[in-house]
Curated annotation (Swiss-Prot):
It comes from Mus musculus. ATP binds at residues 104-111. The modification Phosphoserine is found at residues 6, 369, 634. Residues 376-465 form a coiled coil. Gene3D superfamilies: Kinesin motor domain. This is Kinesin-like protein KIF12. Residues 25-360 form the Kinesin motor domain. The keyword ATP-binding applies. Residues 1-13 have a biased composition (Basic and acidic residues).
Amino acid sequence: MEERGSPDGDPARNLEQGPEGSETPIQVVLRVRPMSTVELRRGEQSALHCSGTRTLQVSPDVAFRFGAVLDGARTQEDVFRACGVKRLGELALRGFSCTVFTFGQTGSGKTYTLTGPPPQGEGVPVPPSLAGIMQRTFTWLLDRVQHLDSPVTLRASYLEIYNEQVWDLLSLGSPRPLPVRWTKARGFYVEQLRVVEFGSLEALMELLQMGLSRRRSSSHTLNQASSRSHALLTLHISRPTSQQVPPVDLGEPPVGGKLCFVDLAGSEKVAATGSQGQLMLEANSINRSLLALGHCISLLLDPQRKQNHIPFRDSKLTKLLADSLGGRGVTLMVACVSPSAQCLPETLSTLRYASRAQRITTRPQGPKSPGVKPPQQVENELLRLQEENRHLRFQLDQMHTTAPGAHGARMAWAQRNLYGMLQEFMLENERLRKEMRQLRSSRDLARAEQRVLAQQVHDLERRLLSACPLPQQGSTPVCPCRMVPAASCHALPPLCYCHHFCPLCRVPLAHWTCPRRECHMPQVLEPEAPGHISQSVWPPPWAPPPSPGSAKPPRERSQSDWTQTRVLAEMLMGEEVVPSAPPLSAGPSNMPYGLRGGSGIPNLTPRLETLTQQINSSLHLSQRQPQPSEDTQSPGQGLSSC
C-alpha cells in the first residue's frame, strides 16, 4: 500500500520542543467534513476512510499520512485541540510570527472550520459549540493576556484579496484597493492598511463580524455561501520591556509577534459549479492565485531551493504568505476535503497539495530588540572585535617597519603613470585625426591636379591638330597604305605624307610609309652614319597640303621658321600648372606631375612623351632636308599616282 506524507508527530508535541533557530516543518491537519443532506439524498457513500488518528485511506492501494486526521464526527472543539493553536498563541506572545490557513475545494468546510457557521442575522451570535478556530483562539488569548505580568498591546487588521486586489475590511472610508509594498525590514506588507487596537473580547468579535459582513460571497451549485475572496485577519502582539527602545527606522515594525488567520477561497471547476459572468471571472482569479501558491510550494520542496528563485511576486496571495511559507514563521495548515465520490478528483488534488506542503521547512526567528542582546551574542561580538583589533595592530606595525612614505609614493607614482598614459593616448588620438585630415586634403588636391593635367594634355593635342589642317575632301586620292595595328592610334612616328587622322580625336595616325610612293619620294642617304634610318624629305604631317592646281613645289621653310617651331614646341612642353596647395610629399620633388600625390592617370606620361617625340622628329627631319634643285621632281608631281 502506498502511503504518502510522514510527519514527525502531532503539532502540539512538535512545537513544545522550541522552534527558534531550527528547521520546523509546516504542520498539516486534515479534516473530512460530514456528508451533506443533498449527498445523503442522492444515496452517496463516503469515499474516504480514516485509519487511526493520522492516516486517511482513499483506496486499498493509496493512503495519506498527516499530523492529524479528523473525520466528520469530530466537533469544533476537537478540531481546535488537535490543531495545537494554543501553542501557536504562546509562540506569538513570545514574539514569533505564526500563521494558520485553511485550504481545500469549494464547499469543503474551510470557512466553517475557521469562523463557524455564518450568523443567522444581525446581532445574533454564533452558538459557542459551533464557534470556529478564530473565536476560540481569541477567547483563549485574551484570557492568557490577563494573567501575564507585563502589559500586552493587541491590534488587529482584516483584509481580503478579491480579483487580485487588496481591500481593507475594517476601513472607515470608502472602499478602495490598497498597494502591496516590500522593504528589507518588513518584507511584503499592505500600505495604508487600518490597524485597530483592542483590549477586550467583545471589541475583537465586533471587528471580526464587521469583516465577515463585508467579505464577498456568493452561491453556486456546490456551495450556497461560497467565499469569493481570500481573507487574512492578523493579530499584532507587542510586549514592551524595560530595556526596549523604539525602532530607529520608521519602516521597521514594532517589536513583537503576530498571529495570522488565512481563509483561502476554494478551488473550483467552472463546469462543475456552473459559474457564469462575474462568478466565472472570480473563479479564474481564485484558481490563478492558488496555482501560484502551489507553484511556490513545489519550488520550496526542492533540495536546492537556495539556488532557485521562488516566485512569490506572481500574486498578491503569495506575497503576503511568503514569510509564512518560506521565511521565519511557524505555519499550520488545515486541509479540508469532501467525502463525496463526485468530488474525488478535487479531493485527491487537495491531498497531494497538503502532502507536499508538510515537507516544507522554515526557520522561525524570535523577536529582535535593538536594545537587548543575548549574552552569547555579546560574547561572540566581543571576541570578533578583539580579533579585529589584533589584526589592525599587526598591520600598523608592518607599516612602521617599511620606509616612510613608500606606500604614498607608490600610489602617487601609479596615479601619475595612469595620468601620463591617458595624456599620451589623447595626444596620439589628436595626431591621428590631424593626419587623417591632411591625407584627405592631399587626396582632394591630387584629384584636382590630375584633372588639370588631363585638361592640359587635351589642350596640347588640340593645338597640335590646329597646326595640321585637314586636307580638303576630294583633293587627293585615298592612300592605299597599310595601317599598323597599334594600341594607340598616334603612338608610332614617323608619319607619312598622306595624312590619316583618328576618327575620334582627329590626331594624325602613325603608319608605315606608302610602299607605292617609296620609289618616287626623294630620300637623303647618309652612308657615313651606320644604322641610320632614312627619312622622307617631304614636309611634316602638319604642313599644309599642296593645292590641286598648283604645280609649284611647296615653299621651303627657312631656318628661322623651324627655330620658331622648336621654341613653340618647347613652350608647349614646358607649360606647368601651379596647384592651389602644395602637393603631397609622396615622392621626390623632381618627379613629374603625373607621378606626384598618389596614383595619376596611367596614360598621361606616355602621351606627353609621344607628342614630344613627334615634334622633335619633325624638327630634326626638316633640318636635314637638302636644298631642292630646279631639275628635281616637284612634290606636287609625285602625288599623281597616290
